Curated annotation (Swiss-Prot):
The name this protein goes by in its record: Cerebellar degeneration-related protein 2
Annotated family: Belongs to the CDR2 family.
Record key words, sorted: Coiled coil
Species of the source: Gallus gallus (Chicken)
Keyword Coiled coil part of the UniProt annotation: yes
Length: 456
């Protein structure tokens, strides 16, 4: 456009007459230089424009790249948000599990406390029973064993009490640890640190769970063993009570027999019994008289008996009398003599029975002491098995308990055999049967004598 304007000016100036040729050349030269400079400037502007286009495209590419990076960052942020949500969920679950574990630890601690209380109650019960056994042992020994010193009752404690208290301490520590875990800061740490902390917490909790399960299993095994041993001890104590009741029954029977003997002795001394041999001889003489006179239908009078002879119990001489008065006087004299003999004989029988009773009583006390010694030894063995109990020697303790049970059953069989066949009982039975027979025979002879004497 500048060149066209210059050409027009040049044409106008040619028309004018005052236009100089030199000036025209100079103007042309200047115009050429100006056009050249303008062309250079135009090329520079075009190059700068192209550079601007290139930079613009580069910036557009950078913008696209940055938008892609922003999208990737948004995706990463979303993923991180999801991970944070999952971590929050896992943290809540872990807190819930921690609370459950704390509750379970408290429940197990309460259970252990209740078990310790029951064990202590059982221990006190066993101690009371041991005291009763020792008191019975002391009362049973009596005057025979004053020289022997009573063995002091050893206080036996269960070996598992220490482990129970240790477990209580461990459970308290677990409870504190769980409270520390639940009271952790809720601030969001970096992902790696949080993951590592959570993994460590999970491993610690799993280890504590395994330890608690193992301790619970061991405690249940120990509790079952203690329950079995306590059941065995209670059964033995029941057997001891049965033996004691049996012994009291035997003592009551002996006292009743003694009272019966005393009552029989008082009755015999009051009635002044005639010896059995006299009445037997009198019975034989009466039967002989009745056999010789069958035509009279067994009716005899006292004068008819005056002609017969009576046999004495002390000798085999015959007594002949002529009158009924002589017979009666002789009969009274013999009754008096026989009453004195019966008194002496009853005293001697009582002395013999008393001696036999004392011997049987001594024998019975010895058997009772022997049974009590066996029971005490079994009781001490059973309690020592509790003290010597350990996890590695469960089989040995069971073997000892079975051996103790066998010894206890043997002792019970021995005591039952002694209770089923007592010798003094048979002796007293024979004595009472003899006394009853003699009494019946005496009553029969007396009734016959009264019937004969009452006849006219």
């Amino acid at each position: 456009m500048l060149a066209d304007s210059l050409v027009e000016e040049f044409e106008i100036r040619e028309d004018e007459p005052w236009y100089d040729q030199q000036d025209l050349q100079q103007d042309l030269h200047l115009a050429a230089e100006l056009g050249k400079t303008l062309l250079d400037r135009n090329t520079e502007l075009e190059e700068s424009l192209q550079q601007m286009y290139a930079t613009n495209q580069e910036q557009l590419q950078e913008i696209e790249y940055l938008t892609k990076q922003v999208e990737l960052l948004r995706q990463m942020n979303d993923q991180h948000a999801k991970v944070y949500e999952q971590l929050d969920v896992t943290a809540r679950e872990l807190e819930d599990t921690n609370q459950k574990l704390v509750a379970e630890s408290r429940a197990s601690q309460q259970k252990i406390l209740s078990l310790t209380e029951t064990i202590e109650n059982l221990q006190t019960h066993v101690d009371d029973l041991q005291r009763q056994v020792e008191e019975l042992k002391k009362s049973g020994r009596g005057r025979m064993n004053h020289e022997r010193s009573d063995q002091p009752r050893s206080m036996h404690s269960f070996s598992c009490l220490k482990e129970l208290y240790d477990l209580r301490q461990y459970f308290v520590y677990d409870h504190v640890f769980a409270e520390k875990i639940t009271s952790m800061d809720s601030q969001l740490n970096p992902l790696e640190e949080e993951n590592e902390n959570l993994k460590k917490a999970v491993t610690v909790l799993q280890a504590q769970l395994t330890l608690e399960k193992e301790k619970r299993v061991t405690m249940e095994e120990e509790y079952s063993l203690v329950v079995k041993e306590n059941c065995d001890l209670e059964q033995r104590l029941v057997d001891i009570d049965l033996y004691r009741a049996r012994a009291e029954e035997l003592e009551v029977e002996v006292a009743e027999m003694r009272q019966m003997l005393q009552s029989e002795n008082t009755i015999h001394s009051a009635e002044k019994l005639v010896p059995e041999s006299f009445f037997i001889s009198f019975k034989e003489s009466l039967e002989r008289e009745l056999g010789q006179s069958p035509a009279d239908d067994g009716l005899l009078t006292v004068p008819e008996l005056d002609k017969k002879a009576l046999k004495r119990s002390s000798s085999e001489n015959f007594l002949s009398s002529a009158a009924g008065g002589d017979i009666l006087r002789g009969h009274e004299e013999t009754c008096i003599r026989r009453a004195e003999a019966v008194k002496q004989r009853g005293i001697s029988v009582l002395n013999e029975v008393d001696a036999q009773y004392n011997a049987l009583k001594v024998k019975y006390e010895e058997l009772l002491k022997k049974c009590q010694i066996d029971e005490d030894s079994l009781k001490h063995k059973a309690v020592q098995t509790l003290k010597q109990y350990s996890k590695d020697s469960v089989g040995n303790t069971q073997y000892d308990l079975s051996a103790n049970n066998q010894e206890f059953t043997n002792a019970g069989e021995l005591l039952s055999s002694t209770n089923t066949l007592p010798e003094y009982k048979a002796l007293f039975k024979e004595i009472f049967s003899c006394i009853k027979k003699t009494k019946e025979e005496i009553d029969e002879h007396r009734s016959k004598y009264k019937s004969l004497s009452s006849q006219p």
